[in-house]
Amino acid sequence: MRYCHFFSAGELRLGVVDECGVLDVTAALSRTRMAVPDSLEALMRAGEKGQSQMERLLRTDSYRLPAEELRYAPAVPHPEKILCVGLNYTTHTTEFDMERPREPVLFGKFSNALAAHREDISVSRYARKLDYEAELVV
């Protein structure tokens, strides 16, 4: 099951993504009396029980939002920490003519470094160069 956070009327919502679109969990819960975690954090804390409750909700509510029309929020909207691994792609090390490190190169970022879907990325006026890099979250 794939989950997402998205914005609806300025409010952060939990969604479940399937082949038909995105189930708005908050809206679905307002149409039922089921006890289902209403945030990704609560869902993770609930473990398998929360997962089975969400599967039941998904089966009972057929209304979906079109995925392409949503404005997605970061998967974890308010992380305590953001730990990053640098130089983890061979192409990135060769681009800078560097040897691949033997041990992971770790660095941190502040939570305000997150940008939601279709949000502008703020660039410091002191920045001299920007470089793209794909980020993975596990």
Please give the residue ranges for each predicted region.
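Generic secretory/membrane-interface signal
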Residues: 63, 74, 113, 127-129
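Structural motif
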Residues: 12, 21-22, 111-113, 120, ...
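N-terminal non-catalytic cap/leader segment that marks the start of a structured domain
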Residues: 1-104
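Residue-level detector of alpha-helical recognition elements and their boundaries
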Residues: 30, 107-108, 122
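Beta-hairpin (beta-strand-turn-beta-strand) motif
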Residues: 87-90, 110, 126
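A structural-propensity feature for long, helix-poor, extended segments
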Residues: 116-137
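Structural signature of FAD isoalloxazine-binding scaffolds in flavoprotein oxidoreductases
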Residues: 100-117, 132
